[in-house]
Amino acid sequence: MAAQSDKDVKYYTLEEIKKHNHSKSTWLILHHKVYDLTKFLEEHPGGEEVLREQAGGDATENFEDVGHSTDARELSKTFIIGELHPDDRSKLSKPMETLITTVDSNSSWWTNWVIPAISALIVALMYRLYMADD
């Protein structure tokens, strides 16, 4: 199968896609590709509502978070109707970057070993005192 050339690709603007956010016309964006899932709504294993919540917008992050199977990814290709216009790609909200925090190595040692050790010692002493009263 030959690769589709750029001139054969149908481009849609975000404004066009946003209009297709109801059960009679359900479009969404995955990785800058536009999908018409109207006929698939009732067949979707996760339910119609899942798709309708994302209709008219970018569902890439949610699609990836669910962890769809290879079969689902192959099936999705049959619903591609075009691509998001290159001028609108920068308008999509980008996922927030993960905040990475660093912990001082002494603090990590303290919280991982000393506090649990002291807690265990206190529990052992309380148990011993309780048993000694009997």
UniProtKB/Swiss-Prot annotation:
One of its GO terms (cellular component) is endoplasmic reticulum membrane. One of its GO terms (molecular function) is heme binding. It is found in: Endoplasmic reticulum membrane; Microsome membrane. The keyword Nucleotidyltransferase does not apply. The chain crosses the membrane at residues 109-131. Belongs to the cytochrome b5 family. Cytochrome b5 is a membrane-bound hemoprotein functioning as an electron carrier for several membrane-bound oxygenases. This is Cytochrome b5. It comes from Oryctolagus cuniculus (Rabbit). The lineage of its organism: Eukaryota, Metazoa, Chordata, Craniata, Vertebrata. The gene is CYB5A.
